[in-house]
Curated annotation (Swiss-Prot):
Specifically methylates the N4 position of cytidine in position 1402 (C1402) of 16S rRNA. This is Ribosomal RNA small subunit methyltransferase H. The keyword rRNA processing applies. It catalyses: cytidine(1402) in 16S rRNA + S-adenosyl-L-methionine = N(4)-methylcytidine(1402) in 16S rRNA + S-adenosyl-L-homocysteine + H(+). It is found in: Cytoplasm. The gene is rsmH.
Length: 307
């Protein structure tokens, strides 16, 4: 099976500095583009563990790579990365970890998954369909203030209050069960002015992040990455919006800067930083954006574990 070439592929492969006999973790298998790239660079003694909470992604991995003894996949969120690594006896031995945050292209393109405002389908949005709460269940029972808070906190939506009110008004007439229904409600609630993005972009993003606990899981995962990496190991994180990137940036700053109070009598040279940022923020080239417009908002940060 030939995998699609994912966002920032070359930059990730270079950033991971893959050793033929190394141990690597792809925390977000998706459709396997990055995992295939890692395997191409590993020797017979190298190992790659992938993770994904979407059963469709796990099925793709099992079908495409079941004969490769170097590869294994765990049907699990990367928020449980440390346990999965520990179960293999790899804690403190991992040479590289990749996290490619957010919704995947196949998830967006499948109307039945309910992630896209441009394709009519059931209002689902669960990355793992086995979890109990889907978007429709939540949107039809949440208080208006809770909806407003989610739209603002996870979508940075300026018109969160009026959209939340419009949702509550609409569901009083009949339950909201389709993506197109929600999209139409948001469009009607939006001020009639020229905007670059589709009016429902931030609303769908916010609800998806909330339903899947995306920021919570990223917040839980990052310290686990630090514990599982070997000294000299690399962490590459691709994010697609400012909320994710801000969280990653703050974690890196916390672990790579002096953060002891000044009154503590310790020399700067004696402070042991745990991470070292490698270069600055990496964005896709214009050539990549032209081939894949979805790459436009991607941002890559790479760090190395020092101690």
């Amino acid at each position: 099976m030939e995998a699609h070439k994912p966002v920032l592929f070359d930059e990730v492969m270079e950033g991971l500095a893959i050793r033929p006999d190394g141990i690597y973790v792809d925390g977000t298998f998706g459709r396997g583009g990055h995992s295939f790239g890692i395997l191409q660079r590993l020797g017979p003694n190298g190992r790659l563990m992938a993770m994904d909470k979407d059963p469709d992604a796990v099925a793709v991995a099992n079908k495409a790579l079941f004969e490769d003894a170097r590869f294994s996949i765990v049907h699990e969120t990367f928020a449980n990365l440390q346990k999965a690594v520990r179960d293999r006896g790899w804690e403190g031995k991992v040479n590289g970890i990749l996290l490619d945050i957010g919704v995947s292209s196949p998830q967006l393109e499948d109307a039945k998954r309910g992630f896209s405002f441009s394709k009519d389908g059931p209002l689902d949005m669960r990355m793992n369909p086995k979890q109990s709460m889907d978007a429709a269940s939540w949107i039809n029972q949440a208080a208006m203030e809770d909806i407003r808070r989610v739209l603002w906190n996870y979508g940075e939506e300026r018109f969160a209050k009026r959209i939340a009110q419009a949702i509550v008004n609409a569901r009083e007439e009949k339950p909201i069960t389709r993506t197109q229904e929600l999209s139409d409600i948001v469009i009607k609630a939006y001020p009639q002015r020229k905007i670059k993005k589709h009016p429902a972009t931030r609303t769908f993003q916010a609800i998806r992040i909330f339903i899947n606990r995306e920021l919570d899981e990223l917040r839980e995962c990052l310290p686990q990455c630090l514990e599982t990496l070997a000294v000299g190991g690399r962490l590459c994180v691709i994010s697609f919006h400012s909320l994710e990137d801000r969280l990653v940036k703050r974690f890196i700053q916390k672990e790579s800067r002096d953060h002891l109070p000044r009154e503590i009598p310790i020399l700067a040279k004696d402070i042991k930083h745990r991470l070292k940022p490698l270069g600055s923020l990496i964005r896709p080239t214009e050539a990549e954006i032209k081939k894949n417009p979805r790459a436009r908002s991607a941002r890559l940060r790479i760090v190395e574990k020092l101690s």
